[in-house]
């Protein structure tokens, strides 16, 4: 995982044509680290049903929604090296949306919004860039609400 992330003067993150994201220069270090973590896995595939992985301290060959969200939180220093399930992330942090980071979780799916852009494995937020089935940055942070499911909204304390 890279410790560096490109920065933008904008107040929200910006997605580049190659699919990686730029963090706002004004964002806290944890937010910039979260975007760097997402960039590190933004072209990884979605795993097959029988693939399961361990510690977040090493890169996995594939990421599902909870693995990707856990990796971003871990990269930001907000989660231990143990990946959480989407159900486990329903109780992460504090209730409600955050200023910089917000999670949307239920028993079947989870995604994370960092500095105004979503990091997700579902395609409600537009076509994935780069193409593929795994985690990608999405410009519309709330597009997944279009799936008709109910989500618990959480955020890390202070963010």
Task: Indicate where each model-derived feature is located.
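...with weaker cross-activation on analogous glycine-rich loops/strands in unrelated enzymes
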Residues: 63, 70-159
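Intrinsically disordered, low-complexity
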Residues: 1-48, 129-159
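Short, flexible coil/linker segments at or flanking structured domains
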Residues: 19-22, 34, 51, 92, ...
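Generic structural marker for isolated residues within well-ordered, non-membrane alpha-helices
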Residues: 35, 69-70
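Solvent-exposed, acidic/flexible segments
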Residues: 24-31, 58-66
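Short linear capping/connector segments at secondary-structure termini
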Residues: 16-20, 49-56, 88-89
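Active-site nucleophile-His-acid catalytic modules used for acyl/amide transfer and hydrolysis
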Residues: 39-63, 82
């Amino acid at each position: 995982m890279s410790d560096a992330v490109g920065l933008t003067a904008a107040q929200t993150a910006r997605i580049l044509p190659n699919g990686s994201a730029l963090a706002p220069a004004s964002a806290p270090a944890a937010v910039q680290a979260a975007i760097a973590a997402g960039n590190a896995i933004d072209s990884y595939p979605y795993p097959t049903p029988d693939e399961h992985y361990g510690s977040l301290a090493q890169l996995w060959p594939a990421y599902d929604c909870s693995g990707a969200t856990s990796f971003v939180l871990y990269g930001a220093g907000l989660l231990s090296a143990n990946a959480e399930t989407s159900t486990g992330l329903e109780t992460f942090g504090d209730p409600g949306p955050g200023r910089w980071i917000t999670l949307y979780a239920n028993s079947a799916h989870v995604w994370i919004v960092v500095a105004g852009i979503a990091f997700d494995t579902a395609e409600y937020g537009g076509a994935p860039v780069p193409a593929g089935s795994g985690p990608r940055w999405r410009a519309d942070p709330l597009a997944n609400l279009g799936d008709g499911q109910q989500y618990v909204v959480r955020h890390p304390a202070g963010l």
